Amino acid sequence: MIPNHILILGSPNSGKLRIANLISKNEEIPNLEDVELHSGLIVKASLRTKYYFLKLNILIDEYSESKGATDEKKLSELHKWYQEFKSEEFGELREVLDGLMFTINMKTDSISFIRDALEIIEQIKISLGDEENLHDWGGFIAVVGSCPENQIVEDDLILEIEDMVLSQGLEFINLSTEGENEYKEKQGKDRIVELIESHDWTNLEMLKVDSKQYETNKLAKMESMKQKLINEKEELDLDDIFSKLNLARDHAQSLTQDERDKYANKVIEEIIDFL
């Protein structure tokens, strides 16, 4: 089977291996922590859900090789990385990429650096599109904020970073969290897993669905919904559903039409599962 490819790009100590480990569950990844440079690492993984099976190559790259680089130096190296990435030499890589995760260290990366870096990420996104339609790319981009273990980042700073990322039309994921937020949406580590599992991959093998099991699950879900409607003691959580829909609609405004369609389908599936 032809593998799919995603790229995790970041500076040293920004969470790249943690993300790769989360996606692949590769036991060898912790051993890579001792490797001085992570540029050029490839983690091979297989992903199986109840609907499909696929193979995935997780490409890891660093635009900066020094942990103590200044903001100016890091931006210069990120821009240099982008210039190489958009060149004809890397055309084949751009064609096979299904996703990009850009990692930042929320403890050490300054707000000004993140703001300027996001502008370069926008240029990288454009380089992944078709030449005639700059935004016609079916992949995903997420900005993942990490924090070194046993250290804390202030909530106000995290919100400021998230607002900057969202204003660029990109998704922000805080690697330090997990579970669900108040809108019943996956966040942090669980959102990364969900993002990978729900993506419309280029190469995959669909699994046969047991029609009897499908009908059984559907009837069980319908019965559960009916009980919530007729039983006064059962709460349907309509407020949560409406809140989720409003939040999804606001987020969709920053997406392209193709991205909106995929996002809408994902939200519908989540609401059905929630019910």
From Swiss-Prot:
Disulfide bonds: none annotated. InterPro entries: Irc6. One of its GO terms (biological process) is vesicle-mediated transport. It holds the Pfam family Adaptin_binding. GO terms for molecular function: protein-macromolecule adaptor activity. Involved in gross chromosomal rearrangements (GCRs) and telomere healing. PANTHER family: INCREASED RECOMBINATION CENTERS PROTEIN 6. Belongs to the IRC6 family. This is Increased recombination centers protein 6. The gene is IRC6.
